[in-house]
């Protein structure tokens, strides 16, 4: 079984690698304990599926944040205007701010 950066390398722009590593260790350690205490491998069999689900959610969020916060080329007016519109919407939408905050601090396990 792989965990942390050995399982998934995150770009530093998202600053999410440590969150994912803790999540991996949480799920893997619980699965190993269950296996060795109760001879039950169910959670071990699901570990990769659980981990990958969180990885893809986190990569999607990191990509979204990178696109939101990095300035597009000056010639690309459409991208710039879309980015500004999204930033404006985030500044006024409580539900958007909640989603941003939940993903920024890390998904619950």
For each of these PLM feature ranges, what is it?
Residues 1-12:
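Short FAD-binding loop at a beta-strand-to-alpha-helix junction that anchors the flavin cofactor
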Residues 12-23:
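A conserved FAD-binding loop/helix module that cradles the flavin
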Residues 13-15, 30-109:
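C-terminal helical "tail/cap" subdomain of flavin- and related membrane-associated enzymes
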Residues 21, 25, 32-35:
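C-terminal, non-catalytic macromolecule-binding modules
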């Amino acid at each position: 079984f792989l965990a942390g950066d050995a399982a998934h390398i995150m770009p530093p722009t998202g600053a999410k690698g440590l969150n994912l590593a803790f999540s991996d260790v949480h799920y893997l350690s619980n699965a190993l304990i269950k296996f060795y205490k109760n001879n039950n491998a169910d959670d071990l069999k699901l570990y990769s599926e659980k981990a990958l689900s969180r990885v893809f959610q986190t990569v999607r969020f990191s990509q979204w944040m990178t696109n939101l916060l990095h300035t597009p080329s000056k010639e690309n007016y459409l991208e710039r205007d879309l980015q500004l519109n999204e930033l404006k919407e985030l500044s006024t939408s409580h539900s958007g701010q909640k989603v941003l905050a939940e993903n920024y601090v890390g998904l619950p396990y």
